[in-house]
UniProtKB/Swiss-Prot annotation:
It comes from the Bacteria. The gene is psbH. The lineage of its organism: Bacteria, Bacillati, Cyanobacteriota, Cyanophyceae, Nostocales. One of the components of the core complex of photosystem II (PSII), required for its stability and/or assembly. PSII is a light-driven water:plastoquinone oxidoreductase that uses light energy to abstract electrons from H(2)O, generating O(2) and a proton gradient subsequently used for ATP formation. It consists of a core antenna complex that captures photons, and an electron transfer chain that converts photonic excitation into a charge separation. Keywords: Membrane, Photosynthesis, Photosystem II, Thylakoid, Transmembrane, Transmembrane helix. It holds the Pfam family PsbH. This is Photosystem II reaction center protein H.
């Protein structure tokens, strides 16, 4: 049998919603927006690294990182 602890009593309310699903789409649209923004961020970083997006006065060179 599991032993009750003070930490377990504190954390129990966090687990009380286990198995319950919010009706409808819930926060899925919000998650989709943040995923799209993160994708754009990664795309910009990749383009800067690949030099397909040139920004004035920004050097993308490994030697410039050692200065």
């Amino acid at each position: 049998m599991a032993q009750r602890t003070r930490l377990g009593d504190i954390l129990k309310p966090l687990n009380s919603e286990y198995g319950k699903v919010a009706p409808g789409w819930g926060t899925t649209p919000v998650m989709a927006v943040f995923m799209a923004l993160f994708f754009v961020f990664l795309l910009i970083i990749l383009q800067l690294y690949n030099r397909s997006l040139l920004v004035q006065d920004v050097l993308v060179d490994w030697r410039s990182l050692g200065r």
